[in-house]
């Protein structure tokens, strides 16, 4: 879909970036000459704007063979960043998509600056294009299928074509992996059970030659996965422990463990959610989707790293067999847990997932979960909450999140917080000390299972879905953290 060329071959649709106070040169000067100075006149008359994110549409003379030119304002070049490049491309391709254009050429060099080289601009182009044109799959009798879809995007450049094509390929992998995560999260709970999620993971493994292991209920019972099994007790659907292994090094060492919460629907159990809180709980497997989206990106790019993805999956339902408040369960680690809140189930399955990842060689751990409403109260819907037991590893995750445009904010875990989750007369831990510092309590609980392994917890309860459309796509699932995990995998430096 995305390809690089050093030739501008009379495209019907053209995209051009404009910096403030910039002059026409290269392909833009060549194009202006073909248009008899029409672009120069448009700029002079103010009919196109270089203001950041402003899209201007121009209808060139029929003799040129072009039907439409889209100008996107880039603002001041001195203030222009990689993240700005992605947003500008998203905005212009959102307009291109609305206009049902199928073949587009982009004058890539007009998006290049000292801070954004051609390969990075190419990455931003393909990633943002795929995110911007994504549409939610519906299940209507007469589905609103687009009659025309974007088929090809040509990045026209005078820079090194191999580097530009490589950038396009990387960006396309990131965009597609994120969109795959979005699609999983948007699926209804009756169409995406733990079994369905496991089948999806197995197909991903077959496509990218990952090792794949799907642990069944009897195997979990034999191993003693009391956290995942307890949450599953109320369900008629069997649980699955999904394990994907990517080995990019000769030796299985310096392994990045990615653990994603895979609760395919969450009623809250006997601590049942209110009617306004239960709708939308199909998205409670957002962490699992992020991990699978990241694994798709990893499969495409094949970094020289080792990755272990672990996804404990079930739904959290109510029945005569379901887990109850006051129950005491035994986790895979051997630690016992008093259940004070059956709606604090995500941390129970993550406890077993983290322990399993450690047992199978994870050197560092990142868990991703739609875990608490408390993180939304604290940080809103645009910032992911983060907690850690290791400052240096956290910095690597934070840098990856920044590069991906998926901001995170660290919340503290103090010794007093740890004491609160250890406060139980009946067990080693309790799963819900109270509402105060709720997001932190959840992180502190999970940290009891990470123990001394470098670990970062990402609570995406506020960022996994968006209530309204943005330039990066429609309302619904965002696929958040798929890109961050993939960047972390590419950039990870083990501590020696």
From Swiss-Prot:
Pfam families: Peptidase_M17, Peptidase_M17_N. The active site is at residues 273, 347. PROSITE patterns: CYTOSOL_AP. It comes from the Bacteria. Its EC number is 3.4.11.1, 3.4.11.10. Binds 2 manganese ions per subunit. It catalyses: Release of an N-terminal amino acid, Xaa-|-Yaa-, in which Xaa is preferably Leu, but may be other amino acids including Pro although not Arg or Lys, and Yaa may be Pro. Amino acid amides and methyl esters are also readily hydrolyzed, but rates on arylamides are exceedingly low; Release of an N-terminal amino acid, preferentially leucine, but not glutamic or aspartic acids. Mn(2+) 1 binds at residues 266, 343, 345. Its cofactor is Mn(2+). Signal peptide: none annotated. GO terms for molecular function: manganese ion binding; metalloaminopeptidase activity. Mn(2+) 2 binds at residues 261, 266, 284, 345. Belongs to the peptidase M17 family. This is Probable cytosol aminopeptidase. The gene is pepA.
